[in-house]
Design a protein with these regions (language model features):
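Beta-sheet-rich sandwich/jelly-roll-like modules and their strand-loop junctions
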Residues: 104-185, 233-287
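Extracellular beta-sheet/turn segments enriched in Thr/Pro/Gly and aliphatic residues
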Residues: 88-113
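Hydrophobic beta-strand segments
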Residues: 33, 39-43, 72, 110, ...
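Structural motif
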Residues: 21-36
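Aromatic- and Gly/Pro-enriched, solvent-exposed loop/edge beta-strand patches characteristic
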Residues: 176-253
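Short, acidic Ser/Thr/Gly-rich low-complexity loop/linker segments typical of extracellular
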Residues: 47-59
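A short, solvent-exposed loop/turn motif at the edges and junctions
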Residues: 71-84
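Short Pro-Gly-centered beta-turn/loop motif in secreted/extracellular proteins
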Residues: 60-69, 220-223
Length: 287
């Protein structure tokens, strides 16, 4: 038997070495004044940022040398992204208000009776590769929040999405909260978020196996010929061991024609890897 290849992707790990400053603030909805729970905050083009907590508060560490003119993006599905600078974010106890995103009312979609169940993605489990999300951070200001992992999926027939599933082989966490993400792919990179609802779900303590998220209520329709990327964004977690925790699973490698996209924070650069995770969309496609 061939030995399993451990891919050194380091999807969710970081360190505080040489970092001397925390950026803090709070995110509220401009219309209601309520907290925007789990809004993302990221430094444009850099692996720096975090997510807000349930009360809209955020905090994350940055190098003392970070320029005050670097761009910051605060965003959440359902709201218009707010763009500012690191210099503005350095002001203490600042509140940032997000404006609601104008929603275009589309036609009511009635599912065609001639539909059949299908899978877009990889339903098999196992492979020569092993992906892992490792958190060795001792400080909530510099943890794995805001990081994303997606699988690229070509849509061969128009369809409605019933559910999203991915397989977990190891889980050392007491709880993990994720956001389901779905992007339009252009020239190999995510270009547009396709969801108008903020869809979140949780993994319970040491939960492994197939994780399933029911999406049938959201009426998500994909078009024939479209390429999308579906996956997860890490919002919040609690470790069983405060010093170390790992979330991991298997993947097919090498996988010709398949790609996984990863970025370490919400505004970091995307990285592409030639492996195929056990992650898929269950759909009802047109015959």
């Amino acid at each position: 038997m061939l030995p399993r290849l451990v891919l050194a992707v380091c999807l969710f790990s970081c360190t505080l070495t040489g970092w001397a400053q925390q950026l803090t603030g709070r995110v509220l909805a401009a219309s209601s004044g309520r907290p925007v729970a789990f809004a993302t905050v990221g430094i444009k083009g850099k692996a720096l940022g975090s997510t807000a907590d349930e009360r809209g508060h955020f905090a994350f560490a940055v190098p003392a040398t970070l320029s005050g003119t670097d761009s910051v993006v605060i965003s959440c599905i359902g709201f218009r992204a707010l763009r500012l600078t690191v210099g503005q974010l350095r002001a203490p106890e600042t509140v940032w208000r997000l404006q609601p995103q104008a929603q275009t009312l589309g036609d009511v979609q009635v599912r065609h009776p001639k539909l059949k169940p299908a899978i877009i993605g990889r339903k098999a489990v196992g492979g020569l590769a092993y992906w892992s999300a490792r958190d060795t951070s001792l400080n909530v200001a510099s943890d794995e929040r805001g990081r994303e992992m997606l699988t690229v999926l070509p849509v061969r027939r128009s369809c409605y999405v019933d559910s999203f599933r991915f397989h977990v082989e190891r889980n050392d966490f007491k709880l993990i909260r994720f956001r389901f993400t779905l992007y339009q792919i252009t020239s190999g990179r995510p270009t547009r978020e396709l969801l108008t609802d903020d869809i979140q779900f949780t993994l319970l303590s040491q939960q492994t196996g197939w994780v399933s998220l029911d999406l049938s209520a959201y009426n998500i329709r994909l078009r024939k010929g479209q390429t999308v990327a579906a996956g997860i964004q890490w919002l919040q977690s609690e470790k069983l061991d405060p010093k170390n925790a790992v979330l991991g699973g298997t993947a097919a490698f090498p996988s010709v024609g398949h790609r996984v996209l990863v970025r370490s924070k919400s505004e970091a650069q995307w990285r592409s890897y030639p492996f195929n995770m056990s992650m898929y969309l269950a759909v009802q496609e047109f015959k």
